[in-house]
Amino acid sequence: MGLKKFLEDIEHHFEPGGKHEKWFALYEAAATLFYTPGLVTKRSSHVRDSVDLKRIMIMVWLAVFPAMFWGMYNVGHQSITALNHLYSGAELATVISGNWHYWLTEMLGGTLSTQAGWASMMLLGATYFLPIYATVFLVGGFWEVLFCMVRKHEVNEGFFVTSILFALIVPPTLPLWQAALGITFGVVVAKEIFGGTGRNFLNPALAGRAFLFFAYPAQISGDVVWTAADGFSGATALSQWAQGGNGALINKVTGEAITWMDAFVGNIPGSIGEVSTLALAIGAAFIVYMGIASWRIIAGVMVGMIAISTLFNVIGSDTNAMFNMPWHWHLVLGGFAFGMFFMATDPVSASFTNKGKWAYGILIGAMCVMIRVVNPAYPEGMMLAILFANLFAPLFDHIVIEKNIKRRLARYGK
């Protein structure tokens, strides 16, 4: 009760006419973080519900935690394994002293030797992920608050989700200044200039990643950015398949074949939060059960992916190994699972009619496979497929609504 009374006592200072009026957006953000606002909709139609936008966003934020924690562990695991493969003894000590992620891990009680356990791996992964997330949150939060102060409205909670999603779809070695640029583009260009939360037609996190991909491709693609080990170069499993098919899926450190279960669990290099389909499915099950994510979109993506990948399997190719990738491998490689569960289901940039959701999902699944298979320069396709489908989402809804109007007119007359 003490905190609530304190917030109520200072509220009048931030209301119109108060001495801190211009800082209302910051006060409202802090107050509603702990308590549900007492505001209600003044005009029809409205629905009373105990779950507001902030609670919905917090649930989505929590839903990505399994993928986030596994991603940090996997970054540490891949990096420590690669370091001990490349260096030993004095060489390893020299490498550790020259990389602040490494020596910070050891200073906090971790080890980068072959005896490293899960705690050391998690700790090393955290030294890569948390700075990226903090940078994205602070820079993106600055733009959110700035636009809210200019427009004189409350801070929208959607950024809690945008920030963590963006941090999870980039490589662990991404320079922090590029992370700041990417989230700036996503928040300002893809969302705020169109009116802010609820008015953007593109997914802000994906738009920010697309900006980095085209502006700074060397730091977000290739073979050297996925494993945070100095001097190590290794392609993602998706790139390996594109180069040589299933037989090319080899762990570069151990020399062992990468199995489907390795990819499903997430024991492969890749973007921080995209590697584990299992962890992503756990989080997705939660938001689908809570009614936040649409199962129709997820099912549509699967239908589109399975249909087109099967078609390419039937056609076959002696020169393009991606033609022969079966649907169950498309599911676990690259950013397909992350995009299907957490990006395609964005309620703002996706279709909102039930039939439109099916068409929207099918388009994403089909486009992803087509880009992966047909485009020789870009083996990943989920990011571009979702952004492409975002442009068609209003059209799908328009067609569904118009057909519904015509059907009702035909049934009941004009």
UniProtKB/Swiss-Prot annotation:
Q: A Pfam family matched by this chain, by name?
A: NQR2_RnfD_RnfE
Record bears the keyword Transport: yes
Q: How does it sit in the membrane?
A: Multi-pass membrane protein
Listed A to Z, the keywords are: Cell inner membrane, Cell membrane, Flavoprotein, FMN, Ion transport, Membrane, NAD, Phosphoprotein, Sodium, Sodium transport, Translocase, Transmembrane, Transmembrane helix, Transport, Ubiquinone
Keyword field contains Translocase: yes
Q: Which residues carry this modification: FMN phosphoryl threonine?
A: 236
Tell me what reaction this enzyme catalyses.
a ubiquinone + n Na(+)(in) + NADH + H(+) = a ubiquinol + n Na(+)(out) + NAD(+)
One annotated GO biological process: respiratory electron transport chain
One MF term in GO for this entry?
oxidoreductase activity, acting on NAD(P)H, quinone or similar compound as acceptor
- Tell me a GO cellular component: plasma membrane
* InterPro entries membership: NqrB, NqrB/RnfD
Q: Which cofactor does it need?
A: FMN
Question: Which coarse location class applies to the principal site listed for this UniProt protein?
Answer: membrane
Q: Where in the cell is it found?
A: Cell inner membrane
What does the record give as EC number?
7.2.1.1
Q: Where are the transmembrane segments?
A: 56-76, 82-104, 129-149, 164-184, 275-295, 297-317, 325-345, 358-378, 381-401
Task: Return the similarity comment.
Answer: Belongs to the NqrB/RnfD family.
- Described function: NQR complex catalyzes the reduction of ubiquinone-1 to ubiquinol by two successive reactions, coupled with the transport of Na(+) ions from the cytoplasm to the periplasm. NqrA to NqrE are probably involved in the second step, the conversion of ubisemiquinone to ubiquinol.
Question: How is the quaternary structure described?
Answer: Composed of six subunits; NqrA, NqrB, NqrC, NqrD, NqrE and NqrF.
NCBIfam families membership:
nqrB (TIGR01937), PRK05349.1 (NF003756)
Question: In its UniProt entry, what is this protein called?
Answer: Na(+)-translocating NADH-quinone reductase subunit B
User: What is the scientific name of the source organism?
Assistant: Vibrio anguillarum
Quick one: which gene encodes this?
nqrB
